[in-house]
């Protein structure tokens, strides 16, 4: 079996259905003897250029290990799902399990937001009148 990295972009109006789509694709991979090494839901992001007059879309990344038949079936499912605007499949040499740069960026943003919320606001300086 070979290792693949797949990114697919879902129409923003179908964002509520993304968890069900992920689960459907996950069962397709695992039921046929494949394994999922990394699965990341990047959420709704700005597109680099409009696709079908759409400027934002929902991104999902999968790193999987499957046979060619399962990959063909998965790409067929992407092709005939109207909610999937684009998909890209890359062949990788080995399983990638580390968080992607996109997820590292999200975690750092969320950690910064938590730190700012947790840090107490500095007390306002009070002036003392000297007589």
UniProtKB/Swiss-Prot annotation:
The keyword Cytoplasm does not apply. The keyword RNA-binding applies. Residues 96-131 are annotated as: Disordered. Residues 103-117 have a biased composition (Basic and acidic residues). Residues 118-131 have a biased composition (Low complexity). It comes from the Bacteria. GO terms for cellular component: cytosolic small ribosomal subunit. InterPro entries: Ribosomal_bS6 (IPR000529), Ribosomal_bS6_sf (IPR035980), Ribosomal_S6_plastid/chlpt (IPR020814), Transl_elong_EF1B/ribsomal_bS6 (IPR014717). GO terms for molecular function: small ribosomal subunit rRNA binding; structural constituent of ribosome. One of its GO terms (biological process) is translation. Keywords: Ribonucleoprotein, Ribosomal protein, RNA-binding, rRNA-binding. Belongs to the bacterial ribosomal protein bS6 family. Binds together with bS18 to 16S ribosomal RNA. This is Small ribosomal subunit protein bS6. It comes from Methylobacillus flagellatus (strain ATCC 51484 / DSM 6875 / VKM B-1610 / KT). The gene is rpsF.
């Amino acid at each position: 079996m070979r290792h693949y990295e797949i990114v697919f972009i879902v129409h923003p109006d179908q964002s509520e259905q993304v968890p069900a789509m992920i689960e459907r694709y996950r069962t397709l991979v695992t039921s046929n003897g494949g394994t999922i090494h990394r699965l990341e839901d990047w959420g709704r992001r700005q597109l680099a250029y409009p696709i079908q007059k759409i400027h934002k879309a929902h991104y999902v990344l999968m790193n999987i290990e499957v046979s060619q038949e399962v990959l063909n079936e998965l790409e067929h499912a992407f092709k005939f799902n109207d909610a999937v605007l684009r998909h890209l499949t890359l062949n990788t040499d080995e399983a990638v399990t580390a968080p992607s740069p996109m997820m590292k960026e999200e975690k750092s943003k969320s950690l910064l937001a938590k730190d700012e919320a947790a840090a107490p606001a500095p007390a306002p300086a009070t002036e003392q009148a000297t007589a």
